[in-house]
């Protein structure tokens, strides 16, 4: 999980460039680690946008060095199966269907799909087959909009 301090470092730089910091993932796979930063803007993200943000963020990360060890930096658009990281993103997509993977089972399942009915500070409520299911945000490993 990405440290909030890293978000605090990244957000002003990305925002000042005219983009929205959509979210971050840090994937550690043995010797190869990856810091993936998702950016967005109303008219979409292109390769040039990713390159521009990569240069600025890379320079800041080299100076601040918030992540120990070696890793690759990737700047990306959230894409079509858009990942959801923050409560404001769940609120933005009320009424949309999402896929959710949880740490602990919810009603015996760790993979759920449903329509976002509500999103509060620490929980979301999904409509799954006309039944409301509350899921703690702290229990969500990954959530994506359904394509």
Curated annotation (Swiss-Prot):
Places the protein is found: Cytoplasm
GO biological processes: ribosomal small subunit assembly; translation
Keywords noted in UniProt: Cytoplasm, Ribosome biogenesis
Any one annotated GO CC term: cytosol
A Pfam short name: RimP_N
NCBIfam families associated with the record: PRK00092.1-1 (NF000927)
Function: Required for maturation of 30S ribosomal subunits.
HAMAP family assigned: RimP
Record family assignment: Belongs to the RimP family.
The name this protein goes by in its record: Ribosome maturation factor RimP
Source organism (scientific name): Legionella pneumophila subsp. pneumophila (strain Philadelphia 1 / ATCC 33152 / DSM 7513)
